[in-house]
Amino acid sequence: MSVLLFGVSHRSAPVSVLEQLSIDESDHGKIVDRVLQSPLVTEAMVLSTCNRVEVYAVVDAFHGGLAVIGQVLSDHSGMSMSDLTKYAYVRYSEAAVEHLFAVASGLDSAVIGEQQVLGQVRRAYATAETNRTVGRVLHELAQRALSVGKRVHSETAIDAAGASVVSVALDMADRRLGGLAGKTAVLVGAGAMGALAAAHLSRAGIGQVHVLNRSLSRAQRLVRKIRETGVRADALPLEHLADALAGADVVVSCTGAVSPVVSLADVHHALAAAGRSAADETAHPLVICDLGMPRDVDPAVAGLPGVWVVDVDRVQHEPSAHAAAADVDAARTIVATEVAAYLAGQRMAEVTPTVTALRQRAADVVEAELLRLDNRLPGLDSAHREEVARTVRRVVDKLLHAPTVRIKQLASAPGGDSYAEALRELFELDQTAVDAVAAGELPVIATGFDAGAPQQPTE
């Protein structure tokens, strides 16, 4: 079984395609349940952000697993398989591991080095764990990816600028407006990205912030935090959006709604109410940062005179979205090292059931021979029998110790699975027994030699 990744991201598709594919966190379970209906898939996890939709799965067969995941995403998005595959990328086995480690490290983000994706990977894994759709393979992979992401951020300066999609978008707005100090902002959405935008606006010296959200109480909580920074702020119901836009200089929308929140009519109303003209497009435009996925702003708004829209596509082409080359290289070196170590550990873990089955086979042979000895020498006293048993077990343990340790070392290298196969052939180990150990149905044999002391005989 190997890890298969099927994904679409800002690097492979335009925002319009990501919009169709976007999966709300509450729907992760439905997508994964459909994927797991196939006997070819044993584990699955969905990572869906404003920049990517990725399904990680443990599959028994590459092509079969790929067809299953592709069909589920095709049905979900309404896209045909042929259209979907134009924008999709596939990673398998080692490449899938490397990709997730890079994603968690911020190396594949629209803003290189941003830290928000690490939290998104953590939430994706937590959701899958809650839904019990991850097993040993994805559990270990996700945990290691989170560890790698933390290491990259702590050991490199890839995030030294503290950049994120939100900060880059607002920096672009700042330049277009000649500064945000004293300006009026409208913040649509009071979630994590909304809070991040509020913090950035406060640091930029924004004069006033109107927060709109479907849940007014949540908007009010964010308003209280904004006021603590000394910025004037108020909470408004989403129905007041058109009026709020009329007095705005900059708008940040990041709600996660399934359809546009900022309509063409809303912006038309705002422009008319504010008396903006076409000349304002260059002099003092209404800057709208659309950071939602699917998009929060009707695409037609970008065509209005006097409006400048910043979306994820525009953000990723901004120079400040790219970290210094030296920091990126340092991060990639860490990722490569961690990938090699992880894969070596996985290969070693895969040979362990075979080694355990060999030890079990040896233990069975020893017990059978001791029973034979009892039958041939029924008069052997208990003390002598125990000494013979300890001696035989020590001999077997010593004979097995060096080759089993060495086989684990050899198995950790690329192509190491051939050593486990050779071990099974040489000692005629039953594959069923090996599989039972791997599934936890048979105990791992602890030998006296490995424990550092002779094993006591069982009566």
From Swiss-Prot:
It is an enzyme of class 1 (oxidoreductase). One of its GO terms (molecular function) is NADP binding. Its EC number is 1.2.1.70. It catalyses: (S)-4-amino-5-oxopentanoate + tRNA(Glu) + NADP(+) = L-glutamyl-tRNA(Glu) + NADPH + H(+). The keyword NADP applies. Substrate binds at residues 49-52, 109, 114-116, 120. NADP(+) binds at residues 189-194. The record marks 99 as: Important for activity. The active site is at 50 (nucleophile). GO terms for biological process: protoporphyrinogen IX biosynthetic process from glutamate. Pathway: Porphyrin-containing compound metabolism; protoporphyrin-IX biosynthesis; 5-aminolevulinate from L-glutamyl-tRNA(Glu): step 1/2. Keywords: NADP, Oxidoreductase, Porphyrin biosynthesis. Belongs to the glutamyl-tRNA reductase family. Catalyzes the NADPH-dependent reduction of glutamyl-tRNA(Glu) to glutamate 1-semialdehyde (GSA). During catalysis, the active site Cys acts as a nucleophile attacking the alpha-carbonyl group of tRNA-bound glutamate with the formation of a thioester intermediate between enzyme and glutamate, and the concomitant release of tRNA(Glu). The thioester intermediate is finally reduced by direct hydride transfer from NADPH, to form the product GSA. NCBIfam families: hemA, PRK00045.1-3. Homodimer. PANTHER family: GLUTAMYL-TRNA REDUCTASE. HAMAP family: Glu_tRNA_reductase. Possesses an unusual extended V-shaped dimeric structure with each monomer consisting of three distinct domains arranged along a curved 'spinal' alpha-helix. The N-terminal catalytic domain specifically recognizes the glutamate moiety of the substrate. The second domain is the NADPH-binding domain, and the third C-terminal domain is responsible for dimerization. This is Glutamyl-tRNA reductase. It comes from Mycolicibacterium paratuberculosis (strain ATCC BAA-968 / K-10). The gene is hemA.
